[in-house]
């Protein structure tokens, strides 16, 4: 029987990720969430002047230079009566694979939308991934301190394009230079906008009731009248917030504000901590695992090399699914069938690491990894479980990688295998030659790999074009047919970083022909870890 203290710890966990299109203001929101959670004293904005603070969650050198989040960071902080685990995900075009995998480790998501632009391409793609698990979504319409589109129009777009009903919780009063604040529909109060920057959280003035004459006085009669009119429309056209519909991903509560101006983020956090689910039941291949089970279980969704330049180590990020982690406990590393003792797990505040003494279902902990842990690995207190749904995506872009100094082949291979294990890039070794082919989902990943090979492995490498259009993992239940396929397709076959057989196609036509000629072979565009 689970004890009340443990159940209390699990029920106050809220584990969520932020998803958005690049430049919708995600990193700024992350900062301000941490600021309101008192996790940092000063929010560092990303694209600042030369001496500006760098954002707390962007801690790798290249991220600091470019002002983009390249890797997923994990930050934990208390808010209201909850303990929040925030997983920051790369917002830049090119880092989708890491982001997809991170979405498998959360119980809810915050979707950030630039209110001037509405629903953008990257947001659509990420929402497809959240759909697979019916993840509950809270929405924050950002940048109200700039000129934005008609809010009603943007809500319609979310409903039509993402298939979710929108229930506004707050509503903007003006925008751009005329932005005066928001009306909180649930609390029946107007919160007036005062711009706060960096680490200043402004005292806000609150006006009770929509018909309060003080509202006309503060925002002007004509704006007050038009807001009352708008709200009448909104109340008629939009559904009321329905908690059940939210929990199955059918309805999203919507908040308005400006992350840069420190305004509206706290309203959103209040809603998220009140409504988002505590850690949920999760499917393993063998059975469903409840978060409140006594016995520990967890899965690895990301591996990060060299988080600490002073220690050239790797950290495996593990989502705890059930039970409690205690320092020094023994666990079963299921894939290897090995008992391991974990005494030095870490908890995260982006880049600052502190030793974890206890962690509970819903928490993310870091395990020191010396090459034995892979993405998708499960750890339990004995039971052989395998959690499903942690995807690997076939790359869309390919380059041949070559050394400037041929004597460093060993270091190059080691670096590439480590980077592929953490999901930064995929590596393919053709069966018929000694080439090393790197595959990625976006161009920027190639730059990241070369930069990291240089700074972490002291290897200088350059890229060349390669005649590869796409790759597919190949599988077949019939060993004889697989052998025949291998014999006839030697020139197109390679092994990936995990030694899985892969078909490398110079053109899509070539791939289609191979699929026609070998109907018994399964050509897969995704592979579970």
From Swiss-Prot:
PROSITE patterns from the UniProt entry: G_TR_1, G_TR_2
Tree of life domain: Bacteria
GO molecular function: GTP binding; GTPase activity; guanosine tetraphosphate binding; translation release factor activity, codon nonspecific; translation release factor activity, codon specific
Keyword field: Cytoplasm, GTP-binding, Nucleotide-binding, Protein biosynthesis
Binding site for GTP: 20-27, 88-92, 142-145
The keyword ATP-binding appears for this protein: no
GO cellular component, one term: cytosol
Domain annotation tr-type G: ranges: 11-280
CDD domains assigned: RF3, RF3_II, RF3_III
Compartment annotation: Cytoplasm
Pfam families assigned: EF-G_D2, GTP_EFTU, RF3_C
Swiss-Prot/TrEMBL GO biological process terms: regulation of translational termination
Keyword Protein biosynthesis: yes
UniProt cross-references to InterPro entries, sorted A to Z: EF-G-like_DII (IPR053905), EFG_III/V (IPR035647), G_TR_CS (IPR031157), P-loop_NTPase (IPR027417), PrfC (IPR004548), RF3_C (IPR032090), RF3_dom_3_sf (IPR038467), RF3_GTP-bd (IPR041732)
Annotated function: Increases the formation of ribosomal termination complexes and stimulates activities of RF-1 and RF-2. It binds guanine nucleotides and has strong preference for UGA stop codons. It may interact directly with the ribosome. The stimulation of RF-1 and RF-2 is significantly reduced by GTP and GDP, but not by GMP.
NCBIfam families the record matches: prfC, PRK00741.1, small_GTP
HAMAP family in the cross-refs: Rel_fac_3
Entry similarity comment: Belongs to the TRAFAC class translation factor GTPase superfamily. Classic translation factor GTPase family. PrfC subfamily.
Name used for this protein in its record: Peptide chain release factor 3
Gene that this polypeptide is encoded by: prfC
